[in-house]
A protein has these predicted regions:
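Dynamic "connector" segments at or just before major functional cores
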Residues: 1-201, 207-220, 246
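An internal, acidic/charged active-site-proximal segment
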Residues: 195-270
Length: 270
């Protein structure tokens, strides 16, 4: 966020040293911590590669796709999740730098421009981004792994209540999306992110996604042993059968019920 000093103040008796507040006409920023992250991104080519998965069908544009991707990515990293924040951040010198511009260059994209940009993303582009995420995960390994343990988890993502496919979830007591992440226990990397509507069942599309992941991993590493773990939300016959057909090991939690309790009491007492 932009900061700008107003009045010069000198404190003579705040300890052993004189403290002086100096007026500056230059716009300052409280988000300089993004600069080393942007340097890491430059070396990895992450945001540039991400933006390359999107199509730009605009006949005329003032803001490049990669700039808008960086605006949103680095904004979220800095805690500015709302598009409205960028009505202020678009003139922040640090955000200009991390987007690829000079600090004294023209302002970045406004909130309406960012909204149009995000709403223009197609289903095909989302599939490309899923594939891109999986390829980035594969590239995170220096050597072919002997085995992989994939954790599949569902997270709530609160919303303002008016976005497309956001619904009120009684358990979380909020309007939300749900995010399903496939992460790797060996290196904590995200292998496959999926955004679901606010009241979606945890199992929605999980087996097609898992099949897609397993087939790609085995195409790259034919001998890798794959196992996955999930909570009781994934416990269903079609998930067990699908995992067996993919020849993967799996550990899935079970919700407590009277039959399970009765059959497990003796074992749990050991």
């Amino acid at each position: 966020m932009i900061l700008q000093t107003v009045l010069p103040i000198v404190f003579e008796e705040l300890g052993p040293k004189r403290v002086e507040v100096e007026v500056s006409q230059t716009q300052l920023s409280s988000d300089a911590g993004l600069l080393p992250i942007r340097e890491l991104d430059r070396r990895l080519g992450w945001t540039e590669s991400f933006a390359a998965q999107l199509s730009d069908n605009r006949q005329w544009s003032q803001h490049a796709l990669v700039e808008m991707v960086r605006q949103r990515v680095f904004g979220i990293l800095a805690g500015y999740e709302d598009q409205n924040d960028h009505d202020t951040l678009r003139s922040d010198p640090v955000f200009k730098v991390v987007a690829g511009r000079s600090p004294d260059d023209n302002n970045l994209a406004s909130q309406p421009t960012l909204s149009r940009f995000e709403n223009a993303v197609t289903a095909g582009e989302l599939l490309r981004l899923e594939a891109w995420s999986l390829e980035e995960f594969i590239r995170s390994f220096d050597q072919p792994p002997h085995s992989l343990t994939l954790d599949i988890d569902l997270f709530d993502d609160p919303t303002h209540g008016e976005q497309q496919l956001t619904f009120f979830h009684g358990h979380y007591d909020q309007y939300q999306y749900q995010v399903r992440l496939v992460t790797c226990a060996e290196n904590d990397a995200i292998a496959f992110p999926v955004l679901l509507h606010g009241t979606a069942n945890a199992r929605l599309g999980v087996m097609p996604d898992l099949e897609r992941i397993v087939r790609r991993l085995r195409a790259v590493w034919p001998d890798v042993v794959i196992r996955w773990r999930g909570d009781c939300g994934f416990g269903a016959p079609e998930v067990y059968e699908g995992s067996e057909s993919l020849d993967v090991e799996y550990t899935i939690g079970l919700a407590m019920n009277p039959v399970l309790k009765q059959n497990s009491e003796e074992t749990l007492q050991l």
